[in-house]
Amino acid sequence: MTEENRIYITHLKVTDVPWHRLTTAYGRGTDFPEHFAVLEQMRDLASVKESLYELTTNMEHQSTLWHATPFGMVFLCRILEKALADSGQNPVAHFLAGELLDFFACILQCFHDGDEMVHAEALPLFSDLLKEEYLWSEEYDEEEDELRYEEDEVFPDDLFYSFYYYSWQAVKAYQDVLEQVPAEFAQPAAAVLELL
């Protein structure tokens, strides 16, 4: 990982990302910041389950990753770090840590499956994913988006591969967190580390 990409990943703020212009499995990432906030609070199990479901089903669908996925992974890594730290005294945090580790293994498996196929090079910088030419329209129009999906090349090859590559890089940037998990999370963390 380049130092520039590592710094970008570790310093990125939720407000730096134009979520409403990033694709997900079921639309756009407009509501991602709200769901991250619910997960960060780790207060109410039902709310955490609902937000986690919304994020994970929109970030990965049938082994396909989306434009919002690598950015989502950055913030889920930070939330995992907090959940692991609080897991001993907060049952919601304990639940969330286990679920996130399983989801990370799923995302990394998607990266490896894609990486084994012939693919384009990733964009040189994580921040390149936010170049204007790759962002979708400012205003969300479901019909317009559906028409765009019918085009031959919805995403340029290097951009599409970058959804996978930078999702992997996001987790890699927080590898030290995975190496220091509480004992009860050692097995799922080891499964994630094996895929890094």
Specify the residue positions occupied by each region the protein language model found.
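Residue-level detector of extended alpha-helical repeat arrays and alpha-solenoid scaffolds
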Residues: 48, 69, 73, 90-93, ...
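Eukaryote-biased recognition of C-terminal alpha-helical segments
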Residues: 122-196
